[in-house]
Amino acid sequence: MKISPSLMCMDLLKFKEQIEFIDNHADYFHIDIMDGHFVPNLTLSPFFVSQVKKLASKPLDCHLMVTRPQDYIAQLARAGADFITLHPETINGQAFRLIDEIRRHGMKVGLILNPETPVEAMKYYIHKADKITVMTVDPGFAGQPFIPEMLDKVAELKAWREREGLEYEIEVDGSCNQATYEKLMAAGADVFIVGTSGLFNHAENIDEAWRIMTAQILAAKSEVQPHAKTA
């Protein structure tokens, strides 16, 4: 199981300490960039990405919750992003061009589905994705309740990947925590984006918070594995 902490949930007063710890323990950094239009919130920025890059060696995954993603690609490449993750709703009419532009800048491509957006919405370019993320909450704010219907979408993406012989990772964003780990693993998730309930609220000290999170994930995995063997 891969872990991608959401930096909009971190303690910014402990920026250096937490970035360095995450870099030593996680698989990705998840960086939410919102414009106040596509979602009603403003969060992180290309400048923030550039500051994380000074301390980090693990891949920086920039989730663009913006109306005009084309305005951010070159900026984020200069800032040091490794992935750019796009919503189908914002790239219709230019999906292939933007995906090609991301690759020309040497970055990988992520696609992300809002709860109401079907997998079918990206069927003509799903094969171009390195990673596909399922939003299991409505986008824009941390700490929202899990939407259980999204388990079917995770399973659908796993089945699609197997049927078409694709290699994208399946990632989950929203309320990844002790209550949902086992269900998400069983459905086929490969990567958890962890935020307030999954990591940062466990303890003030990130080392202790990480220990608690890891124990919870291992416990969930131990429950999933026996079922996988008998399937």
Model-predicted regions and their roles:
Residues 84-92, 133-145, 187-209:
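Glycine-rich phosphate-binding active-site loops on the catalytic face of alpha/beta enzymes
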Residues 35-43, 47, 115, 123-155, ...:
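Glycine/Thr-rich beta-alpha phosphate-binding loop at enzyme active sites
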Residues 42-62, 101-110, 150-170, 212-224:
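Alpha-helix-loop-beta-strand connector modules within alpha/beta enzyme cores
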Residues 3-7, 29-31, 52, 60-64, ...:
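Hydrophobic faces of well-ordered beta-strands that scaffold small-molecule active sites
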Residues 31-101:
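N-terminal active-site wall of soluble small-molecule enzyme domains
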Residues 102, 185, 199-231:
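C-terminal helical cap(s) of enzyme catalytic domains, especially alpha/beta-barrels
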Residues 17-19, 70-78, 117-129, 175-192:
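Catalytic cores of alpha/beta
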Residues 15, 22, 32, 76, ...:
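Conserved, mostly hydrophobic/aromatic
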